[in-house]
């Protein structure tokens, strides 16, 4: 007989299931049987089951027709289990290598349940561990964290009047009371004595799709006598970073979810002692849900259900709470619940107003930057839209550049006086042709977000922006995609784990999206899930590369920057790395290219123009490289820099798609390509066979390629021509004109 029976339901998302099995195979504890219960999947997983059947002691069961849900799967698993202990594992989650080993050691004390640590993540195991090692996950000092928990536990024991059995109190605290909300109340992360479960006939109620865990856990906690907590047994609960296309069960949008929550609470109450601590904690959870979550919907939601049917439904559920549950709530919350029990909708709304008003006051008190958002929502958005106002923004107002710049200048020159143009720019930038300049996230910025008719942005709009009827949003984007974007990314390792969810809402506000080539059109449809109008005219920012006076512009710029006339120029333009960041929109960057070596070998003939991505927050130290390296990272317009560049070196930046319009040599310094391709983003094209230049992995190879650039040009001549036809086919110097004529009619 195996020691542990791991019960693993599978419904959908084969790629998560595969990772779950891969991680389980790495467990240091091997004495377990794996019971896989399949719930009518739409994907073929036979190959996975066959592969891992040879690795695990695996038994496979399928739910019969008419039976579905994780509760049913787990019940089958309990019935079929032969191990001494039970462990529930969801197919999109994973455990760390020593988790099971550390839990089974605790079972030497012959306890009913061992409770481990339940952590949440948006990432796969490799990226989760990377973030833990780099302290990007909330890993507080264990002693301090445990002391705080013990203080809360002591408070809980006293509050619940349950001093008579501290082990049971600890179990209730760690698995129920210390977890926020009802959704986080779960059977996961615990090891159960199977004899204890079977003897007491604990089961999951199969009528509940979302909240069956409480129907198993609450009766179990009430009967539990012995318990141990193990800090180094980690279960990792994985949130899906694409809740639009691949929602986890906890992320599903379902009209019945609210009613099921109430039904599950009311059903579970019937299994519990009326005066027991578990019932007390369950009641407190439903009250907290109403006070902190649902009450705001009653006030704010446009759906009247929250003020009619749902209001009556939650009132019925809360009618059943014990009066002492309310003892520790604040006065306003007590009043809110009393109004609910009296079916006083206006009274509840008044309490919510007061609560939100106080919260808003303290938000403003702590951060005065909140004020302009309040002005946007409550004042500016009620003003009429001004039909002649256009708001422009590039790279979160960091500079005056990119496609919005060229569209603006075309409008300013060809429609003088017709439009009032406003630029969002920080750091005191000046704009030609008389545009008004406003600072991003200022009162004036909020004002123009509310009243402008047109928007021309090359990045996403602020999350707090709400497009009004009659407004027109032109999204130019900022490059032909090499790296996989948004919904084409399997793993999101950037600063915001809700990236896909946020992007989905933001892209719904776009009326036009600019495309530089047929490849971009197809890719943007997929990665942005965009169904709106495409402006397939090339990138306005590339217009300058076709202007008849481009050589004169280049000559003037070289002179302005002080670049010696007798030196050729090498543009080095690296991009950012998703997993190396300080915060939202601020990324770390360590220069891997040996500029000192380049100076030693190339300075007689070349100088280097360094231009990092606008997301990179680090300043690159070029001390000792004066006269050879010109750091142009703060120079606004990279399109102008292209004109003075004889060679371009990049990695995975989209600059080479634009630079190729000049048909000048491109080299790719791809020292970390395997990590970038396999662990971070992945690519849309094969860099080994499709890019118009060689992949180089060391600084020495880069230097050698530059010294032999004529040979490189000849070697990549045919591929470069194919690349040009494929990716530069729309650019002809007139993109700004075509877009202006179509949008600003």
Regions found by a protein language model. Give the residues of each.
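Short aromatic/hydrophobic "clamp" motif used to bind/position activated sugar donors
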Residues: 86
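Glycine-rich, basic loop-to-helix element that forms the pyrophosphate-binding segment
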Residues: 64-81
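Membrane-interface aromatic/basic loop that binds lipid-linked glycans or pyrophosphate carriers
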Residues: 299-383, 391, 409, 413
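Conserved catalytic-core segment of nucleotide-activated headgroup transferases in glycan assembly
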Residues: 399-413, 527, 540-622, 696
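Short, acidic, metal-binding catalytic loop of nucleotide-sugar glycosyltransferases
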Residues: 22-31
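Catalytic binding pocket for nucleotide-activated donors in carbohydrate/polymer assembly enzymes
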Residues: 654-727
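A nucleotide-sugar donor-handling region in carbohydrate enzymes
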Residues: 373, 482-582, 719
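Donor-binding/catalytic cores of nucleotide-activated saccharide
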Residues: 94-231, 235-256
């Amino acid at each position: 007989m195996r020691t542990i029976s791991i019960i693993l339901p599978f419904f959908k998302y084969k790629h998560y299931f595969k990772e779950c099995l891969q991680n389980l195979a790495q467990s240091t504890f091997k004495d377990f049987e794996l019971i896989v219960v399949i719930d009518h999947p739409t994907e073929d997983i036979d190959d996975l089951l066959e592969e891992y059947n040879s690795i695990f002691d695996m038994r496979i069961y399928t739910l019969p027709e008419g039976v579905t849900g994780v509760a049913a799967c787990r019940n089958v698993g309990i019935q079929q289990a032969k191990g001494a202990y039970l462990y529930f594992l969801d197919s999109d989650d994973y455990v760390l290598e020593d988790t099971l080993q550390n839990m089974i050691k605790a079972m030497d004390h012959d306890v009913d349940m061992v409770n481990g640590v339940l952590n949440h993540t948006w990432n796969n195991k490799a990226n989760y561990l990377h973030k833990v090692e780099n302290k990007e996950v909330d890993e507080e000092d264990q002693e301090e964290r445990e002391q705080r928990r013990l203080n809360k536990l002591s408070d809980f024991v006293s509050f619940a009047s349950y001093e008579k059995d501290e082990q049971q109190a600890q179990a209730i605290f760690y698995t129920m009371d210390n977890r926020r909300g009802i959704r986080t109340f779960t059977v996961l992360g615990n090891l159960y004595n199977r004899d204890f479960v079977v003897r007491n006939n604990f089961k999951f109620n199969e009528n509940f799709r979302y909240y069956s865990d409480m129907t198993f856990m609450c009766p179990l906690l009430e009967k539990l006598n012995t318990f141990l907590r193990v800090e180094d047994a980690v279960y990792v609960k994985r949130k899906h970073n694409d809740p639009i296309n691949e929602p986890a069960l906890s992320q599903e949008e379902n009209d019945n979810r609210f009613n099921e929550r109430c039904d599950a609470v009311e059903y579970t109450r019937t299994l519990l002692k009326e005066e027991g601590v578990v019932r007390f904690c369950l009641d407190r959870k439903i009250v907290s849900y109403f006070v902190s979550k649902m009450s705001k919907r009653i006030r704010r939601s446009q759906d009247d259900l929250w003020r009619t049917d749902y209001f009556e439904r939650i009132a019925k559920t809360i009618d059943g709470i014990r009066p002492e549950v309310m003892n520790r709530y604040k006065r306003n919350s007590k009043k809110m619940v009393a109004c609910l029990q009296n079916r006083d909708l206006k009274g509840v709304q008044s309490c919510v107003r007061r609560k939100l008003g106080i919260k808003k006051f303290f938000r403003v008190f702590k951060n005065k930057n909140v004020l302009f958002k309040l002005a946007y929502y409550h004042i500016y958005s009620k003003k009429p839209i001004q039909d002649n106002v256009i708001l422009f923004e590039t790279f979160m107002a960091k500079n005056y550049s990119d496609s919005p710049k060229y569209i603006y200048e075309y409008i300013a020159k060809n429609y003088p006086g017709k439009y009032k143009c406003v630029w969002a720019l920080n750091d005191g930038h000046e704009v030609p042709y008389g545009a008004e300049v406003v600072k991003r996230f200022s009162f004036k910025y909020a004002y123009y977000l509310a009243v402008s008719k047109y928007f021309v942005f090359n990045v996403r709009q602020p999350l707090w922006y709400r497009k009004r009827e009659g407004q027109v949003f032109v999204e130019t984007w900022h490059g032909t995609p090499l790296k996989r974007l948004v919904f084409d990314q399997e793993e999101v390792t950037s600063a915001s784990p809700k990236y896909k969810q946020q992007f989905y809402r933001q892209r719904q506000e776009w009326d036009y999206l600019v495309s530089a080539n047929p490849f971009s059109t197809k890719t943007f449809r997929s990665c942005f899930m965009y169904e709106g109008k495409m402006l397939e005219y090339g990138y306005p920012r590339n217009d300058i590369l076709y202007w008849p006076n481009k050589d004169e512009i280049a000559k003037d710029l070289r002179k302005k920057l002080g670049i010696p006339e007798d030196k050729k120029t090498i543009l080095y333009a690296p991009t950012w790395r998703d997993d190396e960041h300080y915060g939202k929109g601020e990324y770390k960057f360590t220069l891997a290219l040996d500029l000192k070596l380049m100076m030693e070998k190339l300075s007689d003939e070349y100088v280097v123009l360094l231009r990092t991505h606008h997301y990179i927050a680090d300043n690159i130290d070029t001390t000792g490289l004066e006269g050879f390296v010109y750091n142009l990272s703060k120079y606004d317009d990279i399109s102008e820099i292209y004109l003075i560049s004889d060679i371009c070196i990049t990695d995975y930046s989209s600059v080479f798609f634009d630079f190729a319009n000049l048909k000048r040599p491109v080299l790719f310094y791809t020292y970390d390509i395997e990590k970038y391709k396999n662990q971070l983003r992945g690519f849309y094209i094969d860099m080994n066979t499709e890019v118009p230049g060689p992949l180089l992995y060391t600084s020495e190879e880069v230097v050698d390629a530059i010294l032999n650039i004529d040979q490189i040009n000849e070697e990549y001549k045919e591929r470069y021509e194919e690349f040009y036809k494929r990716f530069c086919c729309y650019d002809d110097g007139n993109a700004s004109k075509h877009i202006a004529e179509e949008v600003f009619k």
